């Protein structure tokens, strides 16, 4: 168990190996208008 992190491994990390991913908003919070409409519907 190493107490100190191995910085050599971090410095030699190849960022090109990382895959580019498209970030997609999945759970967007409803607007105040949407919340009010839902309250009115009940």
From Swiss-Prot:
Q: Which residues carry this modification: Phosphoserine?
A: 12
Give the Gene3D superfamilies listed for this entry.
Single helix bin
**Entry-annotated residues carrying N6-acetyllysine:** 4, 15, 39
Which gene does this sequence derive from?
Answer: TMSB10
**What Pfam families does the record tag this protein with?**
Thymosin
Compositional bias ranges of the Basic and acidic residues kind: 1-25, 33-42
Q: What is this protein called?
A: Thymosin beta-10
Residues with the modification N-acetylalanine, per the entry, are: 2
Species: Bos taurus
What this protein is reported to do is described as:
Plays an important role in the organization of the cytoskeleton. Binds to and sequesters actin monomers (G actin) and therefore inhibits actin polymerization.
Cellular localisation: Cytoplasm, Cytoskeleton
Q: Name one GO molecular function term.
A: actin monomer binding
Which terms are listed as keywords in the entry?
Answer: Acetylation, Actin-binding, Cytoplasm, Cytoskeleton, Phosphoprotein
Region of interest: Disordered: 1-42
Phosphothreonine PTM positions: 21, 23, 34
